Amino acid sequence: MSIITNTPKHLQGKRILVTALDLEQREHRGIAVYSKALIRHLRRMGAEVWLLTQFKPITSDLRQLPKETQRIIYSSRTLNELVHGKTLPTSKLEQLIPFLTKFGKRYRQLRRSLKFFKTSFQLKELRSFRLSELSDNPNLRINRLDYLQDVEGIVSLDDVYEASQLTALKKQCKPVSIDLQGFDAFITCCPLNLKPRNIPVFIQTVHDLIALEYAPHNENMRQFTHRLQACLPAKRIHVSSSTCRKFHEHISVNSIGEALSSEDTVVQPPSLYLPSLHRNAGGQANDLPPSSHLLHDQRSKSKSKTSSLKPFRYLLFNSSVEARKNLLFLVKAFAQSGLGRDGIRLCVTGKLKSDSYSKSVREVVANEPGILLTGYVDEATKLDLYLNALALLSPSLVEGFGIPVLDAACLGLPALVSSCDAHREIHDLFDFSDYVLPISILESRDWSSAMQAITGLHNDLAHKQEEERMRRLRRYLRISAEIEARFEEQIAQLVLS
């Protein structure tokens, strides 16, 4: 790949449309984190970033209002759906006579089934607004929508992602076509069954093939295959060499014999978001003492609550709770280690579900008081947990890349990880082999021993908390800057070539 000269605005003047599917979900994990990073760096390179959402709020009640009033209400409702999720339409009769609700539901189900036949969107169906039109808008101060500070405007296309998913269920791969005239590039943040028209650059992001490799992932395999096949005509961002290799072996079957170069893989930036004061301080960053309620004030004379943690006296698991993340294996290994009896805790930030897997996890946790289930945490709390942990634990069966492990390695936080290919790739970056330790997940005793060893090795950190947090912060700023610079260079090359 040719090196772009070190100018600050590679994409100045480019209008780039980015998909918002994962930003529409209730929890911002994984791909949503990648989406935010992509938006931020496109903006930093001078691009005018627009967000494609499938939310198209109800406006039938606004027809008698002035156009400008309609516009601000439409904008407000769109942003509200980005915060809370899609609002289902209800008629006035349904509101007045609740009995009619069941007929409304049947009507909406019929409408949804018709999307199975929706194969094309015209330019006139797109509706958009610029965020600069919203003067002093309260929605733009909501933490969940912080990524909008790097977005020029919102493009609404009613249920475009749902239509593409339904179409991908068909026997043949037939991507949904969209007229995107007026934009310079269209970038998806995950594989989508879409085909843009009238646009010079189309880039799809491929994170993994897990839905095809691992049946318990519970995703329709034909549908996911068609989403991946829709990536073939596009330029592609593969988030790891492992994903790139698997894509070439199983999807891009005509190019198996081609050499896979480093151009095929783009290492995404780490996800921890530091306060602006620390981001700007660089190598002079000061300590960032914990502020989360999960890390109680050590100066307090009151006894520690079971819902609190002590800095550098816990191990961290920061992932969603699903079978491939192997949390059940981890909680059993922690229980076997006996660390809970020594005051060391296991902090699990993933939100448990109502399925049988989460039920099995709960049964182990019920008998192991050293394990703390926090549920989903916000970005500030996540940063606190990373800065004050003894180590990160990631025993995944398979990963597309492994952002939690990348975050840990950038901080210089020790990470005990499974030996899947994606983790090994992170292990081989920079000096990460000093911090990332791949361990087989065939025997839980191996993990119990590793947890005991890492705890004993870093037992002194509790006595030099400020020094250790500053070391991690300064290292993170230095390493992440290198990764971000390379990321921007590769994205700019894809857009401009």
Model-flagged regions — what are they?
Residues S2-S497:
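Carbohydrate transferase catalytic cores enriched for Leloir-type hexosyltransferases
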